[in-house]
Every structure is written in C-alpha cells, then in structure tokens.
Design a protein with these regions (language model features):
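N-terminal active-site segment of His-dependent metallophosphoesterases
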Residues: 46-112, 249
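Beta-strand-rich modules
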Residues: 487-504
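A short C-terminal boundary segment appended to hydrolase-like catalytic domains
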Residues: 53, 318-451, 455-459
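Extracellular fibronectin type III
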Residues: 504-514
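Recognizes extended acidic, P/S/T-rich segments that occur
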Residues: 444-488
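N-terminal secretory signal peptides
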Residues: 1-25, 36
Length: 514
C-alpha cells in the first residue's frame, strides 16, 4: 500500500467509498460489495474494497508480542515486532494499539527491549511524514505474572535482590515510563484525532480486576463517551460472553463477565483484546451485541479455538475427567496419535483499523508472508443502527464450504508415533481442501466413523493452513486425519468427512470404506 500523507491538524475530509477500485479485485466485485454495504447486508469484503479514501483515524491493532530474553525461545528478540511496526509505519498510522503481553517472562529487560524496538522504528514517536504516532498499550498476564511461569526468570536472576529488581510487576510505573515515555496508570484514556481509547492494564493476578474499575471509569466519563461516535476499550483477556460465544470461558482466556455488563450501556464501544492467541481467521473473533468486541490474535504465535466438538477435537488429546493429570492422560489416551495443534510460530497475526465517517474497516493480515489472511471486516457506523456481526445474523448467513467436484477421500493404513514416541498402527484419511465455493472457507472437518458392529465415533481436525490466507499454498493443500487403529470400532469401517465453517454450516461429505 502507498503511504498516506496526512495533515498536521489531523483533519481530513471523507472520500466517497466509490472513489477508486482497488487493483486486487474486479470492478464488478467492488460494486457488489458497495451495494451490499449500502443495503446493510455486508459484514466482510475483499481486502481493500472499503479502505479507499482517507480515513479519519488509522491504527495498528496487535496483541501478545511476547518479547523474550530467552535466547533458546522462538520468541527471542524483537525481529517480528520490528517488522510489523515497520509495515504499520509505511501505512501512515496515527497510533499503535497493543493489548498486552509485551514481555514474555515478566522481566523488566523484556519491556525495555520492546521499548527499544519502538524507538528504532518510530524515532521520536513520529511516522515517516513527521507526524506523531501514539502508543496505546496495555499489559497482560505475562507482563505481570510470567516471572512465575517456569524457572527461566529465577535462573536468569538467581540472587533474590537482583530477581526482585528485574521483576516487572514490582516496577510497572518506572519501567513503563523508561521504556515508552508514558505515565503508567491502571486505567486511563487517550484521545487521538478526536477518538477516545480507554486502556486497562493487567496489574493484579486476577481476572476479576477489570470490570469494577471500568464501571467507575465509565461513570466518571459518561458524558464524553456517550453518543454515536465510537470509542475503543483495551484490555488483555476477552470480555466474557463476547468473542467465541455467549458462554465461552475456556481456561481463563476471558474475564469474569463484569466488563460486558459495564460496556452494555455503550453501543458505540468497540472492545479490543488478546490473550487467547487464537487465529483472527476464525470468524468468531468479532462479535456484536450491546457493543462490539474484537480479538486481535497474537503477533508472536498463533493458536486455535477448541470450543467446537470439544472432546473430539481438535487436538483429540485428552479424555474427559483427566484435566488434573494431563501428562498421564496424554500418555494413556489412544487419541494421542492424531495431529497435535500446538502454537504456530510461522504465522504472526495483526490488524490495521481504519475509521471513516460511516464505517470502521479492519484489515487482517499475517507478517510471515506479508499478506492478507481473510476478507476485511466492515463495521457500519453508527454501530447502534446495524449489527451485522451478531452471531445469530452470521449463522443464518453462513455458507457451507464444499469439496471440489472431483475430490476423493483417500484411506490408508500405516504407523505413526504416539505422544510417547512409540510406533502404533494408524488409519490415515487424506482429502483436498474444501475450497470450491467462493467466500466459504473451511475451518475444520467433521469425521464420522461407523463400524461393522454398529459403533459410531466422531472426530474433527482443523483445516490445513487455516491461520493463513485462503489462497496460500498451505491452505490450498490437502488436510489429513490420523486415527489410532485401536481406538476405532471393530469390523469393516465406513468414513465420512464433511467440511465446516466457523458457525457450524457443513458441506457435503466425502465417503470411503476400509
């Protein structure tokens, strides 16, 4: 993209959305997208369609950069962070938003490394054209608590006094100011180009800390925050009951629900959070109800939401009731032969947010191949008038992904390592990407196994390359499911594989026998 030259007064006229057709799409597709937006039907569009014109505000939106002082860690150093910042600088952003976990191990030197990277890319806190670029950062659990995650921090600083001197949680105010030149406050607010950003830090080892102080803050600033103009709220964990579902609270990635209660009175609020590391290619990463909530994913490494088909996937690694003895369960569970979906260090997610008078555009991309990973999200303004990202709306509009007409399911018998590294007999199912329907992307595949004895099993696997762009070589390639042979029913076996998208729409099945 070309640099955006912006006036020193930060006052820019709104360009009509039909001003030009992005080179990446046809004029027909462009006009169809514009018509859908005007009719209130659009919630996504090909990258760039609604970014034409000069925004009133643009900012980087990333989370979980996890700068690590551990040289053996794949997160070591600031290379990815600097690369991402450099791209955002080239876009002429007005600000950079980071929703926590700047430091990986809760050490002062890691926050200082992040600060040095910022100054390297934005010297004097200025962009390419000399305008100021604001820092809008909050802390996360790794900043506050990760000194106690494992032994690295204590082994790096074995002397108790030296350790205490480098424990970030004990020195938030002074280290924050020395690293970023900003005053630290548990909750605060910045105004950029007339738009307000509320920042709420993780400064206690408790997910219940955010709601009570936000309620007080909103009450104090109600008059300036009320109305149709959007404001942005930042915290590290997802507000409970927003992204990924109304009841989702898996393993502490959400707060206690009081933030949702506080923001419910402000339909113009847009919440940004991280913490889960879950891929922003998952369409459940944006939610609308009484306000709007967005997951920013993870710059350091990408993870995957496992709320669907809970005990049947995606890792297929744990038996019910075994959570207190995870290691033993990993070794004992016959499902352990299935692929393990650990964090992907080859995919680094981030977003670019552009605010116009009638819309907010969120461009999603990854910084390994420097490409978009999905359609842009388009939030109509004012947000109270239209909620295209409400889950019930999107479920009704969901289009099931489909396999190509010549697709075939391949079934082979082989051996594979289990989690104990023992070779075990397995059945391998291979199938092509279900990318035959434009705009319908597979998130996972539902696998049904029927035995000759009448027994049935259900398993699921994530689509290959689901964290990357749909046209990437990885995402366009085949997926597979590896099943431990001794977990399958006896007798002749029948297999059925159906592609599914994030909201549950399932395509037609590929079938086969063994």
């Amino acid at each position: 993209m070309k640099d955006n030259a912006k006036s020193a007064q930060h006052c820019r006229p709104l360009a009509p959305i039909h001003a030009e057709v992005p080179k990446c799409i046809s004029r027909r597709a462009f006009l169809q997208s514009v018509a859908a937006f005007a009719a209130g039907r659009a919630f996504a569009a090909p990258p760039g369609v609604f970014s034409v014109g000069t925004p009133l505000l643009s900012f980087a939106a990333i989370s979980d950069i996890h700068v690590s002082a551990r040289k053996t860690s794949p997160k070591y150093g600031t290379k990815v962070f600097e690369h991402a910042l450099g791209w955002y600088r080239a876009q002429g952003v007005d600000a950079v938003v980071i929703t926590g976990d700047l430091a990986d191990n809760g050490l002062t030197e890691e926050l200082e490394m992040a600060g040095a990277a910022w100054r390297k890319v934005f010297p004097g806190n200025k962009g390419l054209d000399g305008r100021p670029v604001e820092k809008v950062f909050v802390t996360g659990n790794h900043d506050h608590d990760a000194w106690n995650y494992g032994m690295f921090a204590k082994e790096r600083h074995p002397d108790p006094a030296d350790f205490e001197a480098h424990k970030l949680a004990s020195h938030y105010p002074e280290c924050w100011e020395s690293s970023f030149g900003d005053r630290y406050a548990p909750i605060g607010m910045k105004t950029i180009n007339g738009y307000r950003f509320i920042t709420s830090h993780w400064d206690k080892g408790d997910l219940r800390q955010f709601g009570p102080r936000l309620k007080k803050f909103l009450a104090k600033h109600r008059d300036e925050l009320s109305g149709e103009k959007p404001f942005f709220y930042l915290q590290h964990p997802h507000p409970l009951g927003t992204v990924y579902g109304p009841t989702f609270a898996a393993r502490g990635v959400c707060d206690d629900g009081t933030v949702k209660e506080a923001l419910a009175a402000f339909p113009n609020a847009v919440s940004f959070s991280g913490h889960s590391h879950w891929a922003i290619t998952d369409e459940r990463a944006i939610w609308q109800g009484d306000f709007t909530a967005v997951n920013l994913g993870c710059l350091a490494r990408t993870g995957f939401c496992r709320t669907r088909n809970a005990m049947n996937g995606y890792e297929n690694w744990r038996t019910p009731g075994a959570r207190k003895k995870i290691k033993a369960a990993l070794e004992a569970d016959g499902l352990k032969a299935m692929p393990h979906y650990g964090p992907s260090f080859v995919c680094h997610h981030g977003s670019l947010v552009k605010v116009f008078a009638d819309r907010i555009v969120i461009e999603r991309r990854e910084f390994t191949h420097d490409r978009p990973v999905a359609d842009d999200w388009i939030i109509p303004l004012p947000v109270a008038a239209s909620r295209p990202f409400a889950y019930d709306v999107r479920e009704k509009a969901a289009v099931a992904p489909e396999f190509p007409s010549d697709a075939r399911l391949t079934i082979t018998e082989s051996t594979a390592n289990n989690r104990k590294k023992d070779k075990v007999p397995v059945v391998v199912l291979s199938f092509p990407a279900a990318n035959a329907v434009s705009g319908a992307r597979p998130y996972d595949y539902l696998i049904e196994i029927s035995g000759g004895n009448g027994e049935k099993l259900v398993r699921s696997v994530l689509a290959q390359g689901v964290e990357l762009g749909p046209d990437s070589q990885t995402a366009s390639g085949p997926s597979k499911c590896v099943l431990a042979r001794d977990t399958l029913p006896a007798g002749p076996l029948e297999f059925s594989v159906r592609p599914g998208e994030c909201f549950g729409a399932l395509g037609r099945a590929l079938s086969g026998r063994l």
